[in-house]
Swiss-Prot record:
Enzyme's top EC category: hydrolase
InterPro entries: Exonuc_VII_L, Exonuc_VII_lsu_C, OB-fold_nuc-bd_dom
Recorded GO MF terms: exodeoxyribonuclease VII activity; nucleic acid binding
One term under GO cellular component: cytoplasm
Matches recorded under NCBIfam families: xseA
Organism: Clostridium botulinum (strain Alaska E43 / Type E3)
HAMAP family, alphabetized: Exonuc_7_L
Family from the record: Belongs to the XseA family.
Function: Bidirectionally degrades single-stranded DNA into large acid-insoluble oligonucleotides, which are then degraded further into small acid-soluble oligonucleotides.
Pfam family, one: Exonuc_VII_L
Protein name: Exodeoxyribonuclease 7 large subunit
């Protein structure tokens, strides 16, 4: 009997039919540990269920996921009820889950929590030990795979933000047995290279098993003891590793790590302009203040200099001279006025003027003015003053 040649669709549909008609495979209860958990925007939940030897992909559709009463997380031990089938589009075997019940925590999750608690108590996560990320890094060391998307993302973001920054790659395995040793070697290499400003350690997302190298205690201690600041960019935003907690900064993605490490060149230019403007203002203000103080000191110096004192003394003498001359002039004017007034008074009472009117002044031999007739009661020699001269004679009383 000749067997018909099948198409891929024929094969996957046949296998799906066989599985779908199997009673046991349609009524499964499977126990295992959740790994690579993803919550899709559609509401569906995707994850892997594993034990020490095997792993199977699982999906829980939105209608069933909305009824869950347990918060799923990587490393959780669960019991899943559902059915097995083939997803014909990819030919992948997977479990379609109807119920999920929590059984406990997986071995790796327990190990992760134990190391996290140990390092936390030892101070490995303390903020006081975190190193500052340099504001303007010129050379950035990256420890990651040379073929993955991580290094491409970091280079692309860096070129876009500031093409003047150099990226130096230390190629290392980021998955598989002992990959953490290569990551350690990369960190130690850059710490010996004095031209590096900071280090980015990263890889893409994955299951807890795929990211486990970043949970190794030896790597955590090397990150903690690094002299250079380290940005951890492991997995996606929902993924957390021990390296994230112990590093100086945790980035949700490698692209974000580059954004943290590399400021925009336009922002740098703006900052330089603002600083230059501020410095120019401060310099001008300082010069203005210095000039003002200099002028003030010059004025003070002039006021207190010997020559200034001499000049001021001369000025003071001149003022005093002016005041003295003014006072003398006033005094002279006042005295002149007094003299003129006295002259007028004398002139008004001048005997000559009286004599001009026809009067005469009679004096005895002793020059006493004869005012009354009683002074001439006997014969005397008299002098008579007239307006144009004097005459002398003898006075003889009439009997």
């Amino acid at each position: 009997m000749k067997i018909k040649t099948l198409t891929v669709s024929d094969l996957t549909n046949y296998i799906k039919k066989v599985i779908d008609n199997d009673f046991i495979l349609n009524n499964l209860s499977v126990k295992g540990e959740i790994s690579n958990l993803k919550f899709h925007s559609s509401g569906h939940i995707y994850f892997s269920l594993k034990d020490n030897n095997s792993k199977v992909n699982c999906v829980m559709f939105k209608s069933k996921a909305s009824l869950l009463n347990v918060a799923l997380e990587d490393g959780m031990e669960v019991m899943v009820k559902g059915r097995a089938s083939i997803y014909t589009a990819t030919g992948s075997f997977q479990l379609y889950c109807d119920e999920i019940k929590k059984e406990g925590q997986g071995e790796l999750f327990i190990k992760f929590e134990a190391l996290k608690e140990k390092l936390s108590k030892s101070g490995y996560f303390d903020e006081k030990y975190k190193k500052n990320i340099p504001m303007y890094a010129k050379r950035i060391g990256v420890v990651t795979s040379s073929t993955g998307a991580v290094i491409r993302d970091i280079i692309n973001v860096t070129k876009r933000r500031n093409p003047l920054v150099d990226i130096i790659l230390y190629p290392a395995k980021v998955q598989g047995d002992d990959a953490y040793k290569e990551i350690i070697a990369g960190i130690e290499y850059f710490n010996k290279n004095k031209n590096i400003d900071l280090i980015i350690v990263g890889r893409g997302g994955g299951s807890i098993e795929e990211l486990w190298n970043f949970n190794e205690e030896e790597l955590a201690k090397v990150i903690f003891n690094s002299k250079l600041p380290i940005i951890s960019a492991v997995g996606h935003e929902v993924d957390f590793t021990i390296s994230d907690f112990v590093s100086d900064v945790r980035a949700a993605t490698p692209s974000q790590a580059a954004e943290i490490a590399v400021p925009l060149l336009s922002d740098i230019n703006t900052k330089i302009y603002e600083i230059s403007k501020s410095l120019d203002y401060e310099i001008q203000k300082k010069l203005k203040d210095c000039k003002s103080r200099l002028e003030s000191n010059e004025r003070i110096l002039k006021l207190h200099s010997p020559m200034s004192k001499i000049v001021n003394s001369y000025l003071e003498v001149d003022k005093l001279k002016d005041r003295l001359y003014f006072a003398i002039d006033i005094k002279i004017k006042r005295e002149k006025q007094k003299i003129e007034s006295l002259n007028n008074l004398l002139s008004a009472n001048n005997p000559i003027k009286v004599l001009n009117k026809g009067y005469a002044i009679i004096e005895d031999e002793n020059n006493n003015i004869i005012k009354e007739i009683s002074q001439l009661n006997e014969e005397k020699e008299i002098s008579v003053s007239l307006s144009d001269g004097n005459i002398k004679g003898n006075f003889i009383p009439i009997k």
